[in-house]
Amino acid sequence: MENSTGKGTVVLVAFYNKKALGVRYLETALKQAGYHVKNIFYKDFNSVHPKPTTEKELALLRETISACKPVMVGLSVMSSMYLDTVYQVMDSVKQAARAPLLCGGAYATMFPEKLLERGADFVIRSDGEHAIRRLADALVNQTDYQAIPSLAYKEGDQIQVNEIGDILDNVDGYGLPAIQCMDACLIENDALVPGDPQLDTRSYEVIASRGCPFTCSYCCCVNLRRMLPKGVKGVRSRSVKSVIEELRKAKEICKNIVFVHFYDEIFPNIPGWVEEFAAEYDKYIHLPFTIWSHPKMVKLDMLTTLKKVGLTEVIMGIQSGSERVRKDVFHRYETQEDVINAVANIQKAGVFWGTFDLMLQHPFETINDLKESYYLVKRLPGKYELQLHGLNFLPGTDIVDMAIDQGYYTQEELEKIMYAPMDDQFGAYWKQNTTQESQMWYKMIYCWQFKKYRKRLEKFEKNPLAYVGEIEKCYAEAQKLTKLRYLYKKGRVFLYRETKFRG
């Protein structure tokens, strides 16, 4: 419905993410400036079988936007993987309202021209909290917006891209994200569900920092960092006070929370920060939590401190067991011993679960590289979970140019891959299209995470092609065990909460 107070309504649309921290921070910024915000969470996330949008869902979107009579409509375009849905939504927004169409998010930051050429009126790059308020005010007051830092727009046939600016080094200044969006809905499965879909969540997602200190070639974070103005740190951590305040409010509002997931690229390990965080978390939050980290950042003292107050899982990228691939292809400079020591630290600290990512079977990898991944996994101590997947070529990442320069793809071939329909992109992420020998090494890596197969695997590794049937059988069993282990893991985390924090 049309807002009857304040300066007007801004509609924000988030794609394939019911929690969508970006639009939640923007809601806070806009409300502080006197705007009513309508948040539309468009589609839920499914990494294995993502669902394209339907005409019924687009019709529901148009009806919702039309009823708001918005000042402008903002789309959070974080990834290229769902651009087919974004473009259909852009067309629907143009049909539903005369309001200007704005895009922001990681993909929009890196490729403002593409979205402007596709029909967006404006793009905001990098942090949007200040720029979106200034743009909304300019539109409402019919004043000039051309000098707004971080703004991109079309002037006639020319695209103007302003320098990124007016962003905070101290991100506490942006306030807290909207834990409960007061005027929100979810559009999914051809239906509109009123209310904030986060309210019923059992796991709450929070970031304690923005940015990443590393230079991984397959990730856009390094290039987003390079765009920041001089004097703005590449990694900006929130204060402990700000993080704890958000979590305390989340516990009050989202009554079903049993778990906290820190979605930082790398969980902060600033001297003094972890100790202060642990003390405050232990005092007020009392929930098990998981973090993402990196072999260079997994320190025993940090993990021991965090484990005492609820850390139950560390998710860490190994990405390849080949030092050549890690260093020369992925631009990751940890050694084999760094990886093994990081895993050992997780075990020594007594953290319940370690989950490690590997990106395998891509053009840069030889069969010997794949074997090195197997033999590194064999050296990892203790129990752990492996997440094996492929390599996605994402626009704006350094590895795209590397693949072209080294002759694996032409520019045209990669453009087709990177901008394929969503189903094709996610299918490629999980697809295994390699030689039989490669398949056997891949499946042996997968099976090694289960102790019951290890003696057999040591026999198979001598000549995998002589044991194809047996490896396939172990792999099929291991996939079933993975599903059972998931249920065990969730149950143990719940019991951990009940016994540690309520016992």
Predicted features along the sequence, with ranges:
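Radical SAM enzyme core and accessory elements
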Residues: 1-13, 31-32, 58-66, 194, ...
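Radical SAM [4Fe-4S] cluster-binding motif and immediate context
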Residues: 180-353, 360, 375
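Flexible glycine/acidic-rich beta-alpha junction loops that bind and position SAM and/or redox cofactors
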Residues: 46, 112, 156, 214, ...
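Acidic, low-complexity intrinsically disordered segments
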Residues: 2-244
